[in-house]
Amino acid sequence: GAVSHSQVAVDILKENKIDLQNSRITVVGVNKLNEDILKFLSSKNARNVVVVNRHEEKALAFAAPYGYEVKSLRQSNEWMQNTDVLISATSAPHAIFTKEDFHEKKHILVIDIAFPRDVEEDVAALPWVTLHNIEDIEAYAKQNIRLRYDEVGKAEVIIQEELQKFMKWQSYSLMRD
């Protein structure tokens, strides 16, 4: 299972059975987390991706290798209406999306990887919004780490058993010589 925030975001897309070829995916913020997400989307031939940033010039350079569209954060009324999936990871010191930004139209999946949060907590109460915030993503990653540790314990037991068999075989082999 995924342990990095960008990997968890990708897992959430998979779990929600997002049609990457046809869904309108908006990625907000220019940073390493979102770069990893753009690489994944590009590798899955996601065509309908928009990169949004406060500074359009930065977004243009960021989106260029993938050929994705770019919008300004100030134009959120324009691009939010058509968004099926919103992935946000900015360095803003406060929330940049409120309930008023999520128009009642159709379902939207929101993945907020920012700390502090980019999306106000009360957005989760909107019935047409499915919100995964940084706390959800941290819990998911920690659960996957626990599962990995459990598997390590099982592997260690198997290694010890096989090592015992080998040592027994080796001592038997040496006694025959």
Mark where each language-model region is.
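Glycine-rich adenosine-cofactor-binding loop
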Residues: 1-6, 10-42, 46-54
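Helix N-cap at the beta1-alpha1 junction of Rossmann-like dinucleotide-binding domains, i.e.
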Residues: 56-57, 115
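Adenosine-phosphate binding glycine-rich loop
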Residues: 15, 103-109, 113-177
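Short acidic low-complexity segments
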Residues: 67-82
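Rossmann-fold NAD(P) dinucleotide-binding segment
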Residues: 83, 91-111
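Short beta->alpha hinge that forms the Motif I/post-I loop of the SAM-binding pocket
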Residues: 54-55, 75
